[in-house]
Structures are given as C-alpha cells and as structure tokens.
C-alpha cells in the first residue's frame, strides 16, 4: 500500500506540473480537478493503474480464502467474524482514494456508515428467513431488505456523529434479535472443491465493479455500495447449503460482530484520511478495525 501511495503521489505531481506548463499562454486553462487524470485527460501512469488492478483482483480473494479456512478450522462464528472485517470496503475505499482523491473517499466513507446499517438489515433478514426457507429464498429476502434499507437511508441526511451511533447501535440490536436455531453445525464436512474458487472469483470481481462504479454514482452511493454484503452473500448461503440453517445463523452472528470493526475502520477514514494522508490513514484504520473486532469477538464468544 505504501508503494502504491508513493507511486500515485509522484505521478499526480508530474501531472500537475505538466498541466501548468500546458496552460501557459491560454486564457482559460483546464483545471486539474481529479487525481485520476491529467489536464489533457490522459491516465497518470499505466504502470500504477495496472498495479492497482492486480491488487484489486487478488487482495480480496486471498482474504476470502483465509476467512473460509478459518471457518473450517475454528467454526462459523470465527469465520464470520473475520469475514465481517472490511475485506471488501477496505480495499475498495483505498482504491477510490487513489483514483479519486482523499476528499472523495472521506465523503464516501461517511455514507458507508449508513450502508453498514443496511448490511445489518440484510443479516437479520437472512437469519430469520433461514428458519423457513432454503438458501435461495433467504438470500433473495435478505437482498430485498438491504436494497430497501439502503434506498431509505440514501434519502436521509444526517451528520457523522449520528451515523457513527447508528453503526454501533444497529449491529448490537441485531445480535440480540438473532433467532436461536437448535442443532449442530459441523464445518468439517467435506465440501465440493469448486466452491472456494467461486467464492474468491465473486469477491474479486465485486471489488473491481464497485471501484469502477464510484466515479459514476457519486460519493453517497459509492459509500453505501462499499458496504454491500458481498462476502456475506457468498459465505452465508454456502454455509446454509452445506451445513444447515444453524451454521448460517452462526456465520451471521460472526458477521455482525465483525461490523463493529468495519464501523471503526470507516469512522477513522471519514475523520482522519484528509489530514493524515492515504498511507497513514489506512494503516491506522486497519489497525483500529482489527483491535475492535478482536475485542468484540472475545465478548461475543464469552457470552456464548
């Protein structure tokens, strides 16, 4: 990440210098308003863009692979807790900051807190639907709940403090409202070999699509889409299909616990990214998310 940031900053400074030279003798020089392009609308550096593309394609699949193996080794709660970390929103937010600037990324992060609330509605809807429906019906109802909640929240104008409070209170309430499904969830059962590659492919493709959409849909919807339940929609139906409704609910419990770390990450990005810069801001946010998730997972497992 430090290499990408340094490479990007050097390229942007070269672009500003080139734009200034070109504007000499012109009455209305074209401003450099987006760090992704020079004043002559050329990309800043093809090598930097290629490097960002490769990181987009491989970072999230690697994290999905790690969380899936953790679920098999330590159970669905731990696996879900790891999946609840900002594995999608973190890398996607970083790439948005690199492509569109820190101000755009910080504003999108503020909207992401409301998107996290919509993701909690997804989790709660899936957990209760799993008692009556299979994975397909539960996924459809959960997606409907997310989209409806996201649409309503996009119409709400609230400050950052209120959004932070909502991103903490809603996951806590959802944890208490999860259904208790009797039975066992043996995650050690053999799974078809094609499932993990499919999960990894879907995750990498989703990050690529989200970052490319950011410049089209604007800051608010970019922030909401950063918390789109991509990993939840991959891990939870697979757990439901393979190990039953109880495994799906336990995975969701871990996901909700991981949302506190995601909220911490997003809050730090929204408040500290512009003054600290990309490298320091994202490093501090990642550390804060990890420590918060460890603390919450310890408390959740202790109560169980």
List each model region and its residues.
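Cysteine-centered motifs
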Residues: 33-34, 48
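Cytoplasmic-side transmembrane-helix entry/capping segments in multi-pass membrane proteins
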Residues: 78-86, 133-144, 162-167, 188-199, ...
């Amino acid at each position: 990440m430090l290499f990408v940031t340094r490479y990007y900053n050097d390229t942007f400074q070269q672009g500003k210098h080139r734009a200034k030279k070109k504007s000499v003798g012109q009455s209305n020089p074209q401003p450099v308003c987006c760090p992704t392009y020079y004043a002559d609308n050329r990309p800043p550096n093809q090598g930097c863009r290629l490097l960002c593309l490769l990181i987009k394609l491989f970072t999230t699949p690697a994290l999905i692979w790690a969380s899936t193996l953790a679920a098999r080794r330590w159970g669905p709660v731990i696996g879900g807790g790891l999946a609840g970390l900002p594995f999608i929103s973190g890398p996607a937010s970083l790439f948005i900051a690199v492509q569109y600037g820190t101000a755009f990324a910080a504003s999108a992060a503020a909207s992401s807190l409301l998107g996290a609330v919509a993701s909690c509605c997804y989790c709660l809807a899936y957990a209760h639907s799993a008692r009556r429906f299979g994975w397909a019906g539960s996924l459809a109802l959960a997606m409907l709940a997310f989209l409806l909640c996201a649409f309503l929240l996009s119409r709400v104008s609230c400050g950052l403090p209120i959004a932070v409070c909502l991103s903490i209170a809603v996951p806590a309430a959802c944890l208490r409202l999860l259904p208790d499904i009797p039975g066992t969830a043996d995650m050690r059962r053999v799974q078809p070999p094609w499932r993990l590659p499919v999960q990894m492919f879907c995750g990498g493709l989703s990050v690529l699509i989200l970052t490319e959409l950011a410049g089209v849909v604007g800051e608010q919807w970019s922030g909401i889409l950063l918390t789109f339940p991509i990993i939840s929609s991959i891990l939870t139906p697979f757990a439901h299909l393979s190990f039953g409704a109880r495994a799906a609910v336990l995975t969701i419990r871990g996901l909700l616990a991981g949302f506190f770390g995601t909220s911490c990450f997003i809050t730090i990005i929204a408040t500290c990214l512009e003054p600290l810069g990309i490298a320091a801001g994202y490093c501090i946010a990642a550390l804060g998310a990890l420590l918060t998730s460890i603390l919450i997972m310890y408390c959740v497992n202790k109560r169980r």
